[in-house]
Curated annotation (Swiss-Prot):
Enzyme class: transferase
Keywords: Amino-acid biosynthesis, ATP-binding, Cytoplasm, Kinase, Nucleotide-binding, Proline biosynthesis, Transferase
Disulfide cross-links: none
Residues at which ATP binds: K13, S171, D172, S211, G212, G213, M214, K215, S216, K217
Single GO term (MF): glutamate 5-kinase activity
Classification via HAMAP family: ProB
Name this protein carries in UniProt: Glutamate 5-kinase
Protein task: Catalyzes the transfer of a phosphate group to glutamate to form L-glutamate 5-phosphate.
A Pfam family annotated for this UniProt entry: PUA
Pathway assigned in UniProt: Amino-acid biosynthesis; L-proline biosynthesis; L-glutamate 5-semialdehyde from L-glutamate: step 1/2
Amino acid sequence: MRPGLSAKRLVVKVGSAVLTGERGLDLEAMAEIARQVAALREEGREVVLVSSGAVAAGMRRLGLKERPKDMPKKQALAALGQPLLMAFWQEAFAPFGLPVAQVLLTAEDLSSRSRYLNAKATLRALLDLGAIPVINENDTVAFEEIRFGDNDQLSARVAALVEAGLLALLSDVDALYEEDPKKNPQARPIPEVESVEAVLAHAGEENPLGSGGMKSKLLAARIAGRVGIPTLLLPGKRPGVLLQALSGAPLGTYFHARRRYRGEKAWLFGLLRPKGELVLDRGAVRALKERGASLLPAGVKEVRGRFSRGEAVRLLSEEGEEVGVGLANYASEEIARIKGRRSAEIEAVLGYRYTEEVVHRDHLALKEEA
């Protein structure tokens, strides 16, 4: 059996296309998902739901047929719809005696180490209490998050947050295909993906893999895979699909994962959104990989992007290969001034010195580490 299919804890993301029908939210679809989750609970598994549908619920409440295009109205509909969405989930799980708990997050909430740890503790407590956490984007305050596919990536970060053994994406597509099945009915599904990176490398604008919805799912699989969590992309409208797939039925597309990261390194490598990039010389790359050293200013060749002290940065080799992710001890403007210099020169250049390292090894996750 594929790794993760027997996981004790899994995150299930339910997309808007699965939850909605011609008249807004599809209550029968929600009931079917609740039935499957309840069956998993009977097996002794823990399930965290990431649910879209707040905007659709708001549209249903107001009798709107067309989704608005301007952001304030989308956010207003999300505010109207979120309590209704939770009420529908409560109704769906009521026959099984399972309580549901609302948790609203944005990806930025997980970028703060203290908020990340608080969210982690709360979700663990909810699972210990036997509740079904239902997580959604906090759409009314998260401007960038109301766009197609973002809950895919949020679900991957939630999977890392709760240390799930599997991420299941319930979608309106059957699987990842070699070609667009709408254009070519003979297009073949891809049952397994060993390297999401390789698929993403070919997901250009003219490639069906590069379309907004599918690319977001690939990015989610990459985020989860980076911290050792495999991903299943499944046709969410199919009755019993989750139970069947977890029993080993060849459904959807299975994305393999790398070796697992733990603790702060999982947070660094899987949950943070790097604000910039540092290009390192070959000596610095060797020092990080072979000696577990910290990154000193002498090893930095180039600074890309703008970031503040304490924010995450991606570390790259001169050839453009990712080396790791770390927390910067200096802002981008400061590193640009001290790059290539010895640590002893920092104070002379800046007029002050926080630390001798640009990134300390304790706050650094290398790509090959596990």
